[in-house]
Amino acid sequence: MDPFILYSLAFALVYISLYFIFKGNYSNNKHTNLPLGSNGWPILGENIDMAYSSSPEKFIHERMEKHSSQVFKTSLLGQKIAIFCGTSGNKFLFSNENKLLTTWWPPSLTKPLMCPTQSQSQNSVKEIALLNRGFLREILKPENLKQYIPFMDSMARDHLKQEWIPFKEVKIYPLVKKYTFSLACKLFLSIDDFRHVKKLSDPFVLVTSGMFTVPINLPGTPYNRAIKGGKMVHEELMKIIKERKINEKNNHSNDLLSQLISFSDENGQFMNDAEIYNNIIGLLVASYDTTSAAITFVLKYLAELPNIFNEVYKEQMEIAKSKGEGELLNWDDIQKMKYSWNVACEAIRLMPPAQGAFREAITDFTFGGFTVPKGWKTFWSVYSTHKNPKYFPEPEKFDPCRFEGSGPEPYTFVPFGGGPRMCPGKEYARLEILVFMYNIVTNFKLEKLVPHEKIIYKSSPVPLNGLPVRIQPIA
């Protein structure tokens, strides 16, 4: 490369670094008593530290020990962030929604996926989120989800016939992702053609791989690939929405898309295409990443722990024996899966499918003796409580009994958030996990082929080799 170009690039890097250093110092000087911590490298923040840490859990705990067990500052995804820790931090964030804090999503997620609305501002994301919550809470109530259980069971059976039964060895993670996304396409959009599902799922891989990265849009970066994938998802999903609106009178399905099209607010206003798109996207992201990760690690622990598998098998076989030939699962069957759900919760405690969630400070406030300025982003982390021996004795031990009775103390087990921002898809995820567990456990025993498989962390934890197992049919 030409020496002049190299010199120019070096000079530009130094200039940009100094700009961000002085800009950060000036901004920080306006507030006293900020949370302790580090902003890391200019532009990159502590993203490199996070990436080279063996896990997000280690990253969080090292800084809790070094700075504060209640709140510390860092810089991730191009933002100054206050990480709230422990039960007090969780309670504070969950209790101050729309008082001190409001919804915020990283640009690396919103730009590739969110559809611009008429107002086209960060506020539009917040408005959509509020609409999303109210609408989704209604349609995702347990009484409204009952109708989905037979469909989930039927699709799980078909999935096993095609992807599991013909083989002696399978990779769990990619198969579960395929199942959960196909199920979402069927229930949300009434799409069951494999080729049509693939037109959505392939670009989704690009989007989810770049969702929580530094938003640098240069060729070859994860963020750049996410934007390209997002454009393909947007084009395909918008085409589906417009076609459904045209043919809605002849459509007799009661899927999510139909409900979104017919939904109106208290003023009689219907959603526009962008709002419909954004609501669907939220559920597709959750079903593709977090739920599939949860199911994967439930099966991982069932493969590793024969005693746990046997107890789940007993419970599920009691249900199976009560069913007629070909009879599908129903709501009453799900309610009997108490031990199975305790097992799922313990797997989620040890290997949370989502790390936490972001908020934005809408005013200056204090917590733990520190000031969090307006405009800063906040984050609550599952890793600050899920393995705390104060709340979970012998935290590395797999013990489903922790969830018997009233279960863990409030604000200690938080994979679905809490307060007004409790994940509205929690019940949907519970049904999906339990239905899949039932179909696996009543059909197969699992043997891991890579005993100490490495776990890598993206938006969710991922087994490096896809969790390959040998499957043994149960007679």
UniProtKB/Swiss-Prot annotation:
Swiss-Prot/TrEMBL keywords: Heme, Iron, Membrane, Metal-binding, Monooxygenase, Oxidoreductase, Transmembrane, Transmembrane helix
Transmembrane portions of the chain: 6-22
Domain of life: Eukaryota
UniProt xrefs under SUPFAM superfamilies: Cytochrome P450 (SSF48264)
Compartments (UniProt record): Membrane
Cofactor: heme
Main subcellular localisation: membrane
UniProt GO molecular function: heme binding; iron ion binding; monooxygenase activity; oxidoreductase activity, acting on paired donors, with incorporation or reduction of molecular oxygen, reduced flavin or flavoprotein as one donor, and incorporation of one atom of oxygen
GO cellular-component term (any): membrane
Membrane topology: Single-pass membrane protein
Catalysed conversion reaction: beta-amyrin + reduced [NADPH--hemoprotein reductase] + O2 = daturadiol + oxidized [NADPH--hemoprotein reductase] + H2O + H(+)
E.C. designation(s): 1.14.14.64
An individual GO BP term: pentacyclic triterpenoid metabolic process
Residues holding heme: 423
Tissue: Specifically expressed in roots.
UniProt similarity note: Belongs to the cytochrome P450 family.
Family annotation (PANTHER family): BETA-AMYRIN 6-BETA-MONOOXYGENASE, CYTOCHROME P450 26
Protein name in UniProt: Beta-amyrin 6-beta-monooxygenase
